[in-house]
A protein has these predicted regions:
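A short, basic N-terminal segment
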Residues: 1-49
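Conserved lysine of the Walker
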Residues: 62-63
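Sensor-1/coupling segment of RecA-like P-loop NTPase cores
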Residues: 128-150
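Interdomain motor-coupling "hinge/lid" segment immediately C-terminal to the ATP-binding subdomain
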Residues: 146-259
Length: 259
């Protein structure tokens, strides 16, 4: 296995080598979403100048799909990046340049919409790094952010995979649960009592839809905050329009919840 030297310094949270293998092992027990074949097609196909966008609500298997896909690729050529709110596109592109020079050709970037400047700078991923021969797969819960990026920066430069809708047939196959009541109770997501199919970080969260409070928490984190995050960052907030006053008063979340 070829690993970065000890002197290699990254500006974001980059995982390679044995760490990458550990991530792959963590999801080995899970079945694959039906959309996994679309992700496979992108990674194996010729899509120069395009990136793959994996988006959808929390707990619909996005991170698991990334880990399952990278487990099928040469570990010495594959890297995983977990974006944090303190990162920006400049830091990310510096790391992508380093990874390219080290021979990495498959890069999976999780929660990329946390970058405050993603919407206005996303084209660098498709126009530069994809054209250089890197296969880049990004994921995130902020569907509105991806939609706005596709409107401008990534117009005709992406292959999109939407994970939010999980048919009952697929739900039953993945969780081996054939109860329509359970499917409805948990909103068609893959998170249930003592079971976390998606992001390992969510393993300690309250179970979504168990009661009114957990349902409200899910809506706040998976929907309301994402909408506000996108409106704030897109073109420096110019699309807030009439929503700005509600946002500044801290009332926008309640309005979205009522809707």
């Amino acid at each position: 296995v070829s690993l970065p030297s000890q002197t290699t310094e990254f500006h974001t949270n980059v995982v390679t080598g044995t760490g990458l293998q550990a991530l792959a092992n963590s999801v080995a027990k899970y079945g694959k979403r039906d959309c996994f074949s679309t992700l496979q097609k992108f990674v194996a196909g010729s899509y120069d100048g395009k990136i793959c966008i994996l988006y959808g609500l929390r707990r619909t298997g996005k991170t698991t799909l990334l880990f399952q896909m990278l487990s099928e690729l040469p570990i010495e050529k594959t890297a995983y990046i977990k974006v944090q709110t303190t990162d920006d596109m400049s830091r990310l592109t510096k790391d992508l340049k380093v990874l390219f020079e080290l021979g990495y050709r498959y890069v999976f970037i999780d929660e990329i919409t946390l970058l405050s400047d993603f919407i206005d700078t996303a084209a660098v991923l498709s126009d530069v790094f994809s054209m250089m021969g890197m296969k880049i797969v990004v994921s995130g819960t902020d569907s509105l952010g991806f939609a706005m990026a596709n409107r401008d920066e990534l117009y005709d430069r992406s292959v999109t995979i939407h994970t939010s809708f999980i048919p009952f047939r697929e739900y039953a196959r993945l969780l081996n649960i054939r109860s329509v009541d359970s499917y409805i109770e948990y909103g068609g997501t893959l998170k249930m009592e003592n079971m976390s199919f998606d992001d390992p970080d969510a393993a300690f969260d309250e179970v979504a839809f168990r009661d009114d409070e957990s349902t409200r928490k899910y809506i706040d984190t998976a929907i309301s905050r994402n909408i506000q995050h996108t409106l704030k960052n897109d073109h420096y907030g110019e699309y807030f329009n009439q929503l700005r006053e509600l946002y500044e008063k801290g009332e926008l979340t309640n309005v979205i919840n009522r809707i």
